Amino acid sequence: MKYLLYIILIAQFGACQNKKQNNMQETKFNWKPTFTSPKGYPVEVYSGGFADPYQSLHFGISTGSWGETGGSKGESTKIPRGLEVTWLAYAEDCFYRINCDIDSKKIEQLFNEGFKMRGASGKLNHEDYYYIIAGFAPGGVVVVWMAGAGKTTEVGRYQGKKIEIKEPPGLDSHERLYFDEIYRKGVMENEKIVPLEIQEANKNKPIPFGLWDSYRIKYLWKPTFVIQNEGKMNEDFGINFLNGEEINFRDNSFAERIDYKDDYNVKIEAGKQAVPSKIGFSWYDKLGQMYVGNIIFNDDEIFEVFTTLYKDNEDREAELELKVNMTNSFITVKLKGNGKEIAITKSKQKVFESRKKW
């Protein structure tokens, strides 16, 4: 009798374990595939996409910025485990191919965890990642990110190989364009794909291979917002980085570094993060009028400023000071650390009044 009871218990335990494993295997996450490339270096997927399960990345030519979502078709509920892609790099005028596993465990972890965003009331709300992005940079560099509302997180960096593809017979009129030299050159001269400003900036310059790996280096720094004339910082700002990542102050992992004890300025603890590419924030003047400031850094300048300050010690701490002038019309930016201050002067900025008031 005892032996029979033991057999029954073992069978029940095994059934529970199998059910648990099946539930784990059947976990579904809704997401969309998309791809990107650096501005000025458009690519087009010739064939393939995310693998196991397959999700195509054949969406036309990329025109967006590094790390940003692009075109997308379809939706999946299963975690991809690899990349099998052949793409045309127009700036290099060559094909690349990649066939590799990607960090599916990290993808699953990020899907399971999601991220917390603080609402206007201060309440933490759960948010989900909704896109998996594949980025293709010069030299066959491939980076994968996951993105949700106001949050982009890198999954991993991978490497493709340059290949040669001969034009196969029987292609339709569109497919033949991949092998048309005049068409490929025209893509690089198309201002809707490569803005004239970028065409002129890149003219007669070599392709900066390795640059997008350098953008992945993270430094210990923090943004500091200085609002003058009794103004007050609004609890609303976001940062995009050269490595394609994005954070928002409402992101709880970032909000935990913020101290609101100061009545007029937000104090933030330093954290390891890449060089910024954009910063947007808002504030109130002493009468309660709200202002918004958006800064787009010159990639070359901001990258050089950070590498200069950190060249002797990548572990030192620095602060990026954003100081609003007395009339709330302009923002000066400096990187400060190690007894040095380096002004950042080539950024584009827009400061304007908001309809919102205190």
Which sequence ranges carry the predicted segments?
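Bacterial signal peptide processing site
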Residues: Q17-K19
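Tryptophan-paired
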Residues: Y46-A89, F237-G293
